[in-house]
Amino acid sequence: MMLHLQGVLSKQQVAQCREVLDAAQWIDGNVTSGEQSAQAKRNQQLPEGSAAARAVGDAIQDALGRNPRFFSAALPLKVFPPLFNRYAGGDGFATHVDNAIRQLRGTDFRIRSDLSATLFLAEPDTYEGGELCIEDTYGVHRARLPAGDMVLYPASSLHHVSPVTRGVRVASFFWIQSMVRDDGERATLFQLDNDVQRLAAEKGSNDATVVSLTGIYHNLLRRWADA
């Protein structure tokens, strides 16, 4: 399931983040690459753990914590501290799949990457190219979103970033370990949660059907989740 989350950051928050990022020192993006990705990747990245990465990453994690749609879709157990990349002058990232396990450098913190996320930090009219292209059984889905919007998708997906031919594409990317590791089970819970919320808005939270479906949701979550 690929999901577009609108307005994870406000335009003001994006501007504040960009002020920090644009003043930071960037390095070769292959510092976080596995062997396969290193052969496919051409971009720049903020050093993990740098002051700029921590400051903007904290702002993103705070915003995610206030976003009920993100929680419903991801059911997050752990979130890898956000990383940041920059594409310009023909930079791109050929087709690859993300590593299954991500470990924070110099620490014991590691996660299973169930979901990948890209939060766009440049408006699409400021650059050309740079589409995030995600493959699944239904074809290729392309994301080139307004600044502050985020795309969430299974980390098992083949994906690539098309070359940026004009301007600069800046984004944050990170991974989520979900309480529910199976993509199909997680998608079922997300759909059920949306249906319950919609029915509750129509009939009230005390309606018998709403109460029953809420119970089914939590019992499925209890069956499938690792917390």
Curated annotation (Swiss-Prot):
Statement: the UniProt record of this protein carries the keyword DNA-binding: no
Upper taxonomic lineage: Bacteria, Pseudomonadati, Pseudomonadota, Betaproteobacteria, Burkholderiales
Residues binding Fe cation: 96, 98, 159
SUPFAM superfamilies: Clavaminate synthase-like
Cofactor(s), names only, from the UniProt record: Fe(2+); L-ascorbate
Fe2OG dioxygenase domain location: 78-178
Domain of life (superkingdom): Bacteria
Alphabetical keyword list: Dioxygenase, Iron, Metal-binding, Oxidoreductase, Vitamin C
EC number(s) from the headed UniProt entry: 1.14.11.-
Protein name: PKHD-type hydroxylase Bxeno_B2194
Coiled coil ranges: none
Residues annotated to bind 2-oxoglutarate: 169
Provenance organism: Paraburkholderia xenovorans (strain LB400)
Annotated Gene3D superfamilies: q2cbj1_9rhob like domain, Rabenosyn, Rab binding domain
Cofactor annotation comment: Binds 1 Fe(2+) ion per subunit.
NCBIfam families: PRK05467.1-2 (NF003973), PRK05467.1-3 (NF003974), PRK05467.1-4 (NF003975)
Pfam name, any one: PKHD_C
Alphabetized PANTHER family for the sequence: PKHD-TYPE HYDROXYLASE YBIX
GO BP term (any one): DNA damage response
GO molecular function: 2-oxoglutarate-dependent dioxygenase activity; iron ion binding; L-ascorbic acid binding
